[in-house]
Amino acid sequence: AVAESLTNIVWAPLAQGLDSVSLSANWMWPCRSQEGEDARLYEGVKALSDFCCDLHINVPTGKDSLSMTQQYPDGEKVISPGTVIVSAGGEVNDVRKVVRPVVVNEPNSKIYHLDFSSLAPQLGGSAFAQTLGYVGSDVPTVADAAYFRSAFAAVQVMVQEGLLLAGHDISAGGLI
């Protein structure tokens, strides 16, 4: 969720790159209705916190919803899965330089996939994989925070210098 929010905001010319970014985490977890969910929530919060510390970014705000259970009149009970939604915000120094997610028909231009994870390509769960009739279990992840930070900084240089025609994160099946 952290990488997703950051690869969404990377297309804006941030005043101080990744150091400009603050995150908000909204935890929706069924702690009140499922045994063991408190521990899973703790592990999730710790993993998010550790990753953010490794990236040198803060999470000064957030929210929790810990019930996440719906009881119907017929007695059926539906328990939502644990989820975190992360939003990113930061100071933009020139809104006119924001790179839009629309492919531009420009002769001699190229489409590149920029790797933020340093791992083998993984498309499990992406819209692209689904169009091929494949859902997959290998979903994109980030194993090296320093590599991610470096990739983020490289894209920021290209955004600031106006070198990109279009950009979109790969989480929804798009290309960076």
For each predicted feature, which ranges?
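Glycine/proline-enriched, intrinsically flexible loops and inter-domain linkers
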Residues: 1-176
